Design a protein with these regions (language model features):
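Short acidic/polar N-terminal linker immediately downstream of export determinants
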Residues: 13, 64-109, 113-120, 149-153, ...
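DNA major-groove recognition helix of helix-turn-helix/homeodomain DNA-binding modules
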Residues: 45-60
């Protein structure tokens, strides 16, 4: 891919017009047009500005293959997008082996794709971002015949969201492992297949819609955690001293309690602020500590 093609792709992915990009970089719209039609090339100063704006290396901008190793992974692709006001995030990521979603104090949405096996990761996985009023759509597209099975075997995703600009998050993805950390949102809805979940710092209403049997390790949570399942058996592990209200809704659902691997009496606290809730039908939730 040439620099002209890459620049146009990055601009469109970021939802910017040529005028907006020119304003951000500090050049004229005509300069952007020349760059995108391969009739001119930017100075290094402007290349660095573009690199910083889009969160890619200069080598990637110029169409050169990056050989830099990433700690723990052989292949990496990073997409960043500036967020300036509170948003509702609609995130569709398809399949992956592992997903970590975190909140942080910055002002960028960051999607980091990592793999040890997908050598053409940057070409085969593209993150599309659509920014409309009050809403940010993030869509991971698989290209060049990359299958869901290959992604679920070899792809790790790290999603960082700016806590100050989060209203609501809808997350659709199929993974083996999901980790949620240091995130604050009015509501986070997870929809998809998942086997192992770790919640290590979440504030708000968390809902997991999955019909798979799950193991959920909830270490730190303020707010509520709701399971919406059909014909599933899941286990929720809580730390000692974690106070919560347990609620059972839906049809034919059952709540059970365990301590040290043995069945126990209900140890929930009706006066607690945090709520654990089972919805759906014909499902069982074991709450353990």
């Amino acid at each position: 891919m040439t620099f002209a093609q890459k620049l146009k792709e990055l601009r469109i992915r970021a939802g910017m017009s040529q005028e907006k990009l020119a304003e951000r970089v500090g050049v004229s719209r005509q300069a952007i047009t020349k760059w995108e039609t391969d009739k001119g090339a930017p100075e290094m100063e402007n290349l660095l500005a573009l690199s910083d704006l889009f969160g890619v290396s200069v080598d990637e901008l110029l169409g050169r293959e990056s050989r830099r190793p990433t700690a723990g992974y052989l292949y990496e692709s990073v997409t960043e997008y500036d967020v300036a006001d509170p948003k509702r995030y609609d995130v569709k990521l398809g399949g992956a082996r592992r997903l970590t979603i975190r909140g942080y104090e910055g002002e960028k949405l960051r999607v980091r794709l990592l793999s040890d096996t997908l050598s053409t990761l940057e070409a085969d996985c593209k993150v599309r971002i659509d920014d409309s009023r009050g809403r940010l759509d993030v869509d991971l597209q698989r290209l060049n015949g990359l299958t869901e099975a290959a992604a679920r075997e070899g792809l790790t995703i790290e999603l960082d969201l700016p806590n100050r600009y989060i209203n609501h998050v809808e997350l659709a993805v199929n993974v083996n492992e999901l980790t949620i950390g240091e995130l604050a949102a009015e509501e986070l809805e997870y929809d998809g297949k998942v086997q192992n979940v770790t919640v290590d710092g979440f504030e708000g209403a968390l809902e997991i819609d999955s019909n798979q049997d799950m193991k959920v390790d909830c270490r730190r949570l303020t707010g509520s955690l709701a399971f919406n399942q059909v014909a599933a058996v899941s286990r929720l592990t809580l730390p000692q001293g974690f106070a919560f209200v347990a609620r059972k809704r839906g049809l034919g659902n059952s709540l059970y309690f365990e301590e040290a691997g043995q069945r126990a009496e209900d140890f929930s606290d009706p006066d607690a602020q945090t709520v654990i809730e089972l919805n759906g039908m014909k499902s069982e939730l074991f709450i353990c500590r």
